[in-house]
C-alpha cells in the first residue's frame, strides 16, 4: 500500500515514510503473511522463531498433510507426532510444546474458538499472548498484526540492523523501544504495518546483510550514513545513531 493523506509534519514520520516508499518501489508488494487462515498464521508465527521461513514451509506442509493446521487438531495430536512433523524448524521439541500450550489456552479460556481470542482489542490481545508460555514480543505482534488484523508493529533482527545503520535508532534500543518508536511516528494502519515489516525483511534478507552488505544495490543508500563506509569485522556500522524518540 501507498500512504496518502497522512500527517507527515513530524521529521521522524517523514523519514520513515520515505524509507517505506523507497522499499516498496524496489521490492514491490510482498503479500505477506503466506497463510490461508488465522490459525495457520499463529502456528507459523510460533514455528518461525529462530529459523528461516523455508524451514517453516516444510513443517506447515507436513502438518497440513496430517490435518493438523488447526489449534483443535494440535490440541488432540500426540506431542511426539507433532515433533516429527516440525523437525525442520529446529528446536522442534520445544516448539511442539509451545503449540500444545497455545492450543490448550484457546481451548480452556475461549472454548476452542480462536476468533474470540482474536476479537480482543490489540492491547488486550497482546497482553494475553505475552502471558502464554513460549510467546515473546515478536511472536505476539505477528499474531496481533497478521492473524487478528490489528495494528501492532513487528520488530525483528532485520529492523534493528537496518534502522541502526540508517542512523534512525540506537543499537542498544530494546524491543519495546523500537516498536513504540515506529508506532508513535507512523499512521496506525494495519496495511502499512503489514507491508513495512515485510519490506524490511526483504531488504535485510537480500541486501542489508549482517556481513558484507550489498550497499551498492540498496534503494536506501542516499539516506544511509553507513553507505560507502567500512564496517567492523562484526558487520556493525561505524556510524553513530540517534535515539528513538
Task: Tell where the protein language model's regions lie, with residue ranges.
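Acidic, metal-coordinating catalytic segment for phosphate/diphosphate chemistry
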Residues: 245
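Phosphate- and other anionic-substrate recognition elements at nucleic-acid/protein interfaces
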Residues: 1
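Catalytic cores of DNA base-excision repair glycosylases
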Residues: 4, 11-238
Amino acid at each position: 500500500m501507498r500512504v496518502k493523506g497522512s500527517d507527515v509534519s513530524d521529521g521522524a514520520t517523514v523519514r520513515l515514510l520515505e524509507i517505506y516508499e523507497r522499499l516498496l518501489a524496489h521490492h514491490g508488494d510482498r503479500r505477506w503473511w503466506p497463510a490461508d487462515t488465522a490459525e495457520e498464521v499463529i502456528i507459523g508465527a510460533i514455528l518461525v522463531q529462530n529459523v528461516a521461513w523455508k524451514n517453516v514451509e516444510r513443517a506447515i506442509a507436513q502438518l497440513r498433510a496430517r490435518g493438523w493446521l488447526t489449534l483443535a487438531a494440535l490440541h488432540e495430536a500426540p506431542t511426539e507426532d507433532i515433533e516429527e512433523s516440525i523437525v525442520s524448524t529446529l528446536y522442534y521439541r520445544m516448539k511442539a510444546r509451545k503449540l500444545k500450550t497455545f492450543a490448550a489456552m484457546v481451548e480452556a479460556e475461549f472454548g476452542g474458538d480462536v476468533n474470540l481470542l482474536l476479537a480482543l482489542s490489540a492491547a488486550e490481545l497482546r497482553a494475553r499472548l505475552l502471558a502464554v508460555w513460549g510467546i515473546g514480543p515478536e511472536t505476539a505482534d505477528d499474531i496481533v498484526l497478521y492473524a487478528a488484523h490489528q495494528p501492532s508493529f513487528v520488530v525483528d533482527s532485520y529492523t534493528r540492523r537496518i534502522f541502526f545503520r540508517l542512523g534512525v535508532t540506537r543499537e542498544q534500543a530494546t524491543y519495546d523501544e523500537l516498536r513504540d518508536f515506529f508506532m508513535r511516528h507512523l499512521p496506525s494502519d494495519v496495511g502499512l504495518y503489514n507491508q513495512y515489516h515485510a519490506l524490511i525483511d526483504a531488504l535485510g534478507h537480500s541486501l542489508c546483510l549482517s556481513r558484507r552488505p550489498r550497499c551498492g544495490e540498496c534503494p536506501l543508500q542516499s539516506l544511509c550514513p553507513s553507505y560507502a563506509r567500512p564496517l567492523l569485522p562484526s558487520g556493525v556500522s561505524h556510524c553513530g545513531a540517534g535515539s528513538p524518540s
